[in-house]
């Protein structure tokens, strides 16, 4: 069986080396006669897996000891509510940036708990970039400052960390582990796993200890309180054990690749060559301001959108899967997360070039 190049936005491609390990260990994990999916979450086997995964992630991202790393059930959308529930405390206001689909959904959810103050709105630029930081409307006081580092639907990525004295909260669901960054600049970071860390159903939260002291809103269920999850080391109930195990394997894979910095260089090369091809083409187009182009999700359109179905059909026939754009924007989207190889991007560029010659 030959595997295709999977450009899905999520659930996304998983490194083949990791899949081979899962295959080899699935029936009999480390000689115990059981799958890791079958063992007790409180048994020594899984506790060892969980602790090693946390150590590896802390090492990869240089997470200070003053932060807890939580492995939680649910997707990132649950965090849209958990963040204000846990961090508002006595504040009535929180600051948000509207940079695209996912930040907009977070803002809508936050309205159930507070008055979200928009520092800036990329809608002014038709979501093709971020307004200059000098123009942002920044209040002196607010519970936190929230932004999405990479908008998977819109193809926008922040090339910088926003400059603010407020507690910085960031959704890094689609680019965590794709480049180094200074964790200490943030109060809280969260990321669902199905982009760069494995399976849907697991979300990783990195939260500063000081924020765990904030009193959650009175209506916050105990299960949605960060402090309780931290106290119980993410074992309030049965966690998503297999997803946690797989994330741990991916952390090992990242280390074996040379670490996050090595992957960052590779990701930059992949994105640069794809954007270079699109920019030179008279048939394909990317509307995003080059400064804010995502390294993870490359959106593009065909000059003749009547050819969209044919493009997708022929791409699939050539082993290039899941290139259809998000239903809200249409067009095409190539998601080139950590697991996507440079060979995969080269194959896509070659196919796009051949398609343009035939139909351009």
Curated annotation (Swiss-Prot):
Sites where the protein binds L-glutamate: 42
Pfam family, one: Aminotran_5
Biological process according to GO: L-serine biosynthetic process; pyridoxine biosynthetic process
Binding site residues for pyridoxal 5'-phosphate: 102, 152, 171, 194, 237-238
Note accompanying the cofactor annotation: Binds 1 pyridoxal phosphate per subunit.
Catalytic reaction equation(s): O-phospho-L-serine + 2-oxoglutarate = 3-phosphooxypyruvate + L-glutamate; 4-(phosphooxy)-L-threonine + 2-oxoglutarate = (R)-3-hydroxy-2-oxo-4-phosphooxybutanoate + L-glutamate
Coarse class of the protein's main subcellular location: cytoplasm
Organism: Coxiella burnetii (strain CbuG_Q212)
Domain of life according to the entry: Bacteria
Pathway it works in: Amino-acid biosynthesis; L-serine biosynthesis; L-serine from 3-phospho-D-glycerate: step 2/3; Cofactor biosynthesis; pyridoxine 5'-phosphate biosynthesis; pyridoxine 5'-phosphate from D-erythrose 4-phosphate: step 3/5
Identification of the protein by name: Phosphoserine aminotransferase
Function description: Catalyzes the reversible conversion of 3-phosphohydroxypyruvate to phosphoserine and of 3-hydroxy-2-oxo-4-phosphonooxybutanoate to phosphohydroxythreonine.
Residues where N6-(pyridoxal phosphate)lysine is found: 195
């Amino acid at each position: 069986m030959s595997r295709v190049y999977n450009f899905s936005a999520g659930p996304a491609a998983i490194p083949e080396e990791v899949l081979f390990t899962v295959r080899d260990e699935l029936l009999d994990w480390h000689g115990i006669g059981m799958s890791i999916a079958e063992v007790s979450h409180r048994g020594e086997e899984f506790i060892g897996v969980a602790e090693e995964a946390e150590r590896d992630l802390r090492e990869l991202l240089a997470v200070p000891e003053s932060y807890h790393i939580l492995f939680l059930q649910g997707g990132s959308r649950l965090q849209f509510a958990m963040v204000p529930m846990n961090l508002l405390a006595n504040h009535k206001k929180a600051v948000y940036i509207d940079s695209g689909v996912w930040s907009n959904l977070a803002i809508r959810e936050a309205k159930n708990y507070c008055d979200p103050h928009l520092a800036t709105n990329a809608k002014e630029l038709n979501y093709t970039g971020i307004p200059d930081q000098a123009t942002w409307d920044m209040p002196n006081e607010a519970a936190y400052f929230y932004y999405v580092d990479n908008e998977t639907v819109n193809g926008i990525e922040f090339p910088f960390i926003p400059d603010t004295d407020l507690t910085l909260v960031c959704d890094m669901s689609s680019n965590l582990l794709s480049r180094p960054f200074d964790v200490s600049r943030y109060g809280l970071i969260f990321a669902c796993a199905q982009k760069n860390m494995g399976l849907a159903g697991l979300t990783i939260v990195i939260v500063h200890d000081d924020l765990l002291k904030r009193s959650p809103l009175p209506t916050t269920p105990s299960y949605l309180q960060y402090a309780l999850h931290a106290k119980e080391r993410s074992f309030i109930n049965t966690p998503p054990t297999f997803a946690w195990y797989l994330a741990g394997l991916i952390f090992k894979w990242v280390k074996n690749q040379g670490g996050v910095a090595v992957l960052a260089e590779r990701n930059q090369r992949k994105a640069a060559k794809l954007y270079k091809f699109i920019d030179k083409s008279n048939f394909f187009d990317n509307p995003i301001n080059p400064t804010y182009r995502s390294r993870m999700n490359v959106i593009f359109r065909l000059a003749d959108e009547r050819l969209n179905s044919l493009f997708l059909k022929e791409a699939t026939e050539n082993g290039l899967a899941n290139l259809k754009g998000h239903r809200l924007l249409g067009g095409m989207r190539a998601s080139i997360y950590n697991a996507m190889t440079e060979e995969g991007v080269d194959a896509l560029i070659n196919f796009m070039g051949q398609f343009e010659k035939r139909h351009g």
